[in-house]
Amino acid sequence: MNKKSLWKLILILAIPCIIGFMPAPAGLSELAWVLFGIYLAAIVGLVIKPFPEPVVLLIAVAASMVVVGNLSDGAFKTTAVLSGYSSGTTWLVFSAFTLSAAFVTTGLGKRIAYLLIGKIGNTTLGLGYVTVFLDLVLAPATPSNTARAGGIVLPIINSVAVALGSEPEKSPRRVGHYLMMSIYMVTKTTSYMFFTAMAGNILALKMINDILHLQISWGGWALAAGLPGIIMLLVTPLVIYTMYPPEIKKVDNKTIAKAGLAELGPMKIREKMLLGVFVLALLGWIFSKSLGVDESTVAIVVMATMLLLGIVTWEDVVKNKGGWNTLIWYGGIIGLSSLLSKVKFFEWLAEVFKNNLAFDGHGNVAFFVIIFLSIIVRYFFASGSAYIVAMLPVFAMLANVSGAPLMLTALALLFSNSYGGMVTHYGGAAGPVIFGVGYNDIKSWWLVGAVLTILTFLVHITLGVWWWNMLIGWNML
């Protein structure tokens, strides 16, 4: 371990120790106070990363089990800390990662991309919309926007940029600068449009459910995000194109698409089966209530079906590093969060807010302030998941005691987590991957990100709120 990592480790170990030696605040049990210290240390660990996320959470889980065993007086078993690993939410994420990996291993993701390039990629603006349609098609089945944007969309679009004579060092503004920003800004929009488009969505909804006791189905989420999301997908490539127009306008898309499809060859049986399974997965998630199952059940059935049909092999599942990493840290953070809820930490936090913050009955003002703050603080987080575990419970409790409309605030918070990450090139793991290709500078990236973030915010608090109220009135949320 190097010196820098050692200091990071000392910091996250010091946090629960310091909090543990301090007396618990009035109204909060000693168990809840010490568990909060461990949870806070886990959050800091996710941000500064002395170890990979799974290691940080395993340490936090181990410490929490020791604390529960010694301070709970039998009220809770140590296995309560492990509840996140038995949560359907955790397995939904893992199963969706397997579906996502199948698009790469079968080549179906590439085939869809080249078909789109051949149809609408005859201009550089059209290529921007290729990123829109490709990401939108893949989003429901890809709970990692890093895998989606960085693993599927980026390699294809980058090869197109190179083919058009755009190089990071010599000619970034020819087309690469525009296309790279399009990939990132688009994926930050599609990531909030579907419950399963980003792992953080599933974690965020679980927290909203624990704190505000609101239920939102896969279909309800997609309907709520659909109108503002589609509007932003339509304008995003155009806004980037207007602010930083590429030097070339026309593209020989037919040649590029033909070469790409020729390399892939005829559509294979695995691709056809995957396409069928993908459609069935979407139908299952949309009509899960009518079918009498939940979203997690659909995801696990899909994974089992892909293994049964040979679309993916068990070796493919084992090699899916992103899925296993997420399973470990995700299950850990859900378990810790659920335990904090059980020991009434969030109830205590609500009372603190209620006694110290007042909007004097102006619930709509509270709604505006909470959502605006949720975007501003994203400047300080390089991880959407770290933001969720650190700030979402705070904003949710603030909404609960301020008189803000709860369903509207919940939806706005669930969506702002993703688009708030537009503001910087480190606002999500996909950012460093795309920015690292070398076509973009920080100034232009941050400027475009700020403009699109503000525009998205305005769309959500105007047309979005109107649309959500309509859905609530129709009993569709």
UniProtKB/Swiss-Prot annotation:
Cytoplasmic compartment spans: 1-5, 49-50, 109-148, 241-272, 319-356, 400-445
Keywords for this protein: Cell inner membrane, Cell membrane, Membrane, Transmembrane, Transmembrane helix, Transport
Periplasmic side: 27, 72-87, 170-219, 294-297, 378, 467-477
Membrane association type: Multi-pass membrane protein
Membrane-spanning intervals of the chain: 6-26, 28-48, 51-71, 88-108, 149-169, 220-240, 273-293, 298-318, 357-377, 379-399, 446-466
Keyword Metal-binding attached: no
Protein name, entry field: Inner membrane protein YbhI
Gene: ybhI
